[in-house]
């Protein structure tokens, strides 16, 4: 379950970033923060999702989008960008996990992603929601919740 929890600290994105506006001109790195409109934040979030989950380039995504003093609310990882880099590196591989996005959004500088996470070769899938707080152009805070689907779930559509 630790692997599931560690994987849940980021966003998941197996397909295109449709629904989030692309930035017209990338000006990464986005930290330290600069002011940004909601549309710009959506574009920056789309770039983060593309780099971190589709391209599986956690180093690029975190260095370009996450503040050095990033506040991490996951109980298994300390705050700070470098701690996330150190912990997530081994897990960002299609050989370890598959993601399916169920829902996503961004409003008032808060972004969320609800996704299905399947560990390769391992048991029941988990439902995960990641929540990120932006300060302008920069991701500065993260929360997540994860729940593994019970093997004998009564409701076949529960969680997804």
Predicted regions and their residues:
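Fungal secretory targeting signals
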Residues: 1-19
């Amino acid at each position: 379950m630790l692997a599931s929890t560690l994987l849940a600290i980021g966003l998941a994105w197996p397909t295109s970033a449709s629904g989030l506006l692309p930035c017209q001109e990338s000006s990464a790195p986005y930290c330290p923060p600069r002011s940004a409109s909601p549309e710009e934040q959506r574009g920056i979030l789309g770039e983060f999702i593309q780099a971190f989950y589709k391209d599986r380039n956690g180093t690029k995504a975190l260095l370009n989008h996450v503040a050095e003093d990033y506040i991490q609310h996951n109980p298994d990882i300390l705050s700070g960008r470098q701690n996330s880099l150190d912990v997530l590196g081994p897990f960002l591989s299609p050989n370890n996990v598959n993601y399916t996005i169920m829902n996503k959004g961004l409003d008032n500088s808060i972004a969320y992603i609800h996704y299905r996470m399947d560990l390769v070769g391992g048991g029941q899938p988990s439902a995960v929601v990641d929540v990120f707080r932006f300060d302008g152009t920069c991701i500065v805070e993260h929360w997540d919740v994860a729940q593994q689907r019970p093997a004998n779930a009564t409701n076949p559509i529960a969680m997804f």
